Design a protein with these regions (language model features):
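Conserved NAD+-utilizing ADP-ribose enzyme module
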Residues: 1-85, 91-174
Length: 174
């Protein structure tokens, strides 16, 4: 999965977009596939996801983002984030890609949408397709585990649309 950086939200420095830093935890959605409803993995990359037994959480920690070679397509995308924890900022887009992944994978797998949090202080990039790539991401096994543990990081996570209303695009993040 690649994220096409939305340059309306990011400064460009040394020909690369500058990551933003979360000022509050953000609620996002992660699409995962499963063959048995117990063992999950990410579509495309096939990274195995093992939820913690007690809290029902899985922690992504990425120290660096990686960018694909610069290219221009019909939609004029210039910067692609390849490495990073990818997720969606709303359920509608997550559901759209869930259906897409199910069609691609055939009848042997099922695809699920999971609640996830980008913790406060994480770096992130906003994409052109309601997607986001972050340096840290906590994925929850189910909605119950999310509701039980969403304040684990010390602040109440907010929807991305509310985050933008509250903080704008404050591009002074370094």
């Amino acid at each position: 999965m690649c994220l096409c950086v939305n340059l309306g939200f990011h400064k460009v420095k040394s020909n690369k977009p500058v990551a933003l830093v979360t000022k509050q935890s953000i609620l996002v959605y992660k699409v995962l596939s499963s063959t048995d409803g117990v063992h999950y993995y990410t579509p495309f990359v096939l990274k195995s996801i093992n939820f913690d037994d007690e809290y029902g959480m899985f922690f992504y920690k990425t120290t660096r983002f990686s960018f694909d070679k610069e290219y221009l397509s019909k939609r004029n995308y210039k910067h692609l984030v390849v490495k990073g924890a990818h997720s969606y900022v709303n359920l509608a887009r997550a559901n759209y890609d869930k259906i897409f992944f199910e069609i691609l994978s055939g009848s042997t797998t099922t695809t699920h949408i999971h609640y996830a949090i980008i913790p406060k202080g994480s770096k992130f990039y906003i994409g052109n397709d309601c997607d986001i790539a972050s340096s840290n991401l906590v994925v929850f096994e189910n909605e119950t585990k999310y509701n039980e543990n969403k304040d684990y990081f010390g602040d109440e996570p907010i929807e991305f649309s509310d985050y933008l209303k509250k903080f704008g695009t404050e591009l002074d993040n370094k």
